[in-house]
């Protein structure tokens, strides 16, 4: 079965026609139906009137014709359904504004940001190409009062503190999981338009008034408490009046001028005294408050402070004892050098001979130096005296001679160069003489 529909417009006349072809086994029949012409002003349901076939053999196609007629009737009814009229442009875009506001509020709540009107204004305007106003939010509440909870608040916008509205979702709204806010708002908007056909615009619901920026309860209460405290602590300013005895003179103008000048001087002096007393009282209060704050310490804080103080005292005492011990050792070495100055000069000469014998060596064992010193003719010291003399030299001249332990062996190291120049014998003897002279002068 094949259906074909033809439409043509000629002189405001609509022509509708179709033909049905039935394919049978080995034969082809063509059924033609009559077509009625109607004016374009008539409804679409009357555009074509289908008549039943005159041939009785074509009775098989009657159900198909009935179904086609029913479809045409239902389509005409759908097109002729009356929709609620649009009242205003704000009503036309109110659904779009609601969707944009809902998206922005969800975004800001997801990132833990307070969705305020000043924050949503630019974003919603960018999404809808419409400038968002407070009246739009009030109209949304008129259509759906439970859609948002709008409360006044303070916020920082562009570096300034401003009063605005905060948007949030009501806590007591029990909505199912698969609930779409945009669909619900559209349904409520259509319902409102059907119920209020006579109104030309959606009325705006009254919102709470914005708080004033000048009213700050915290600062105001603290300021009141401060003023009451100053009134209670400050003394009353009393300006004493000095009574002057009248002078029995004929010049009354002179007497009046003197009286006025005296009263002005007295008032200025009393005012200056009161101001000074007030300043002293404030300084006394500040010092007493500092003392009270310093006294308010717990037992744990006091114990910690005491232990830290004791630690500092112990460290200072240990440092002083170590310094005294070092000074005593140095004095002992210097005393010994002063008594045995000649023998130490001979020992330095023997060491320089040892260094010249081994020009590439800087370190020697203690036994090696002691044996070389005993083999010399100019030295008549025992091994213990030689070892003690070398130890005293290492303490007196640490920049030239040092003693280190390598296991159980004492190793004596001599520095041949100081500051890029060779260490000379005369330089060492001069240092010894200066130390000995300083010790002798200090003892005398």
From Swiss-Prot:
Q: Which InterPro entries match?
A: Cdt1, Cdt1_C, Cdt1_C_WH_dom_sf, CDT1_Gemini-bd-like, WH_DNA-bd_sf
What GO annotations for molecular function exist for this entry?
A: DNA binding; DNA polymerase binding
Q: Which cellular component, as a GO term, is one annotated location?
A: nuclear pre-replicative complex
Query: SUPFAM superfamilies per the record?
Result: Winged helix' DNA-binding domain
- What binding partners and quaternary form does the record give? Interacts with cdc18.
* Biological role stated in the UniProt entry: DNA replication licensing factor, required for pre-replication complex assembly. Faithful duplication of the genetic material requires 'once per cell cycle' DNA replication initiation and elongation. Central to this control is the tightly regulated formation of prereplicative complexes (preRCs) at future origins of DNA replication. Required for the recruitment of the MCM helicase complex to the replication origins.
**What is the name attached to this protein's record?**
Cell division cycle protein cdt1
Name the gene that codes for it. cdt1
């Amino acid at each position: 079965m094949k259906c074909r529909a033809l439409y043509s417009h000629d002189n405001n006349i609509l022509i509708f026609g179709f033909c049905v072809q039935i394919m049978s086994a080995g034969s082809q029949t063509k059924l033609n139906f009559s077509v009625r012409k109607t004016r374009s002003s008539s409804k679409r349901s009357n555009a074509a009137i289908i008549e039943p076939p005159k041939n009785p053999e074509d009775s098989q196609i009657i159900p198909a014709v009935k179904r086609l007629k029913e479809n045409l009737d239902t389509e005409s009814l759908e097109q002729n359904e009356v929709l609620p009229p649009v009242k205003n442009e704000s009503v036309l875009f109110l659904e779009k504004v609601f969707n944009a506001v809902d998206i922005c509020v969800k975004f800001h709540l997801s990132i833990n940001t307070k969705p305020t009107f000043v924050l949503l204004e630019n974003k919603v305007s960018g999404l809808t190409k419409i400038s968002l106003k407070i009246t739009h939010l009030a109209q949304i509440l008129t259509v759906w009062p439970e859609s948002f909870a709008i409360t006044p608040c303070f916020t920082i916008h562009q570096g300034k503190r401003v009063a605005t509205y905060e948007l949030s979702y009501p806590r007591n709204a029990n909505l199912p999981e698969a609930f779409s806010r945009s669909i619900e708002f559209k349904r409520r908007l259509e319902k409102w338009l059907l119920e209020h056909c006579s109104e030309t615009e959606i009325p705006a619901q009254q919102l709470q008034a914005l708080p004033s920026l000048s009213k700050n309860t915290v600062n105001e209460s603290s300021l009141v408490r401060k003023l009451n405290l100053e009134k209670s602590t400050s003394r009353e300013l009393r300006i004493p009046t000095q009574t002057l005895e009248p002078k029995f003179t004929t010049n009354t103008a002179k007497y009046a001028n003197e009286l006025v000048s005296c009263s002005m001087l007295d008032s200025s002096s009393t005012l200056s005294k009161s101001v000074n007393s007030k300043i002293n009282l404030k300084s006394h209060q500040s010092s007493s408050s500092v003392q009270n704050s310093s006294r308010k310490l717990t037992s744990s804080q006091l114990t910690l402070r005491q232990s830290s103080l004791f630690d500092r005292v112990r460290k200072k005492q240990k440092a002083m004892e170590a310094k005294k011990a070092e000074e005593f050792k140095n004095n002992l070495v210097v005393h010994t050098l002063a008594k045995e100055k000649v023998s130490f000069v001979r020992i330095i000469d023997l060491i320089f001979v040892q260094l010249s014998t081994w020009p590439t060596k800087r370190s020697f064992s203690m036994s090696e130096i002691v044996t070389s010193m005993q083999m010399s003719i100019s030295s008549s010291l025992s091994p213990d005296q030689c070892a003690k003399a070398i130890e005293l030299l290492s303490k007196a001249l640490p920049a030239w001679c040092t003693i280190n332990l390598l296991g159980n062996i004492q190793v004596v190291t001599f520095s041949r160069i100081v500051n890029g120049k060779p260490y000379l014998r005369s330089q060492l003897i001069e240092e010894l003489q200066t130390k000995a002279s300083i010790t002798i002068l200090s003892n005398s």
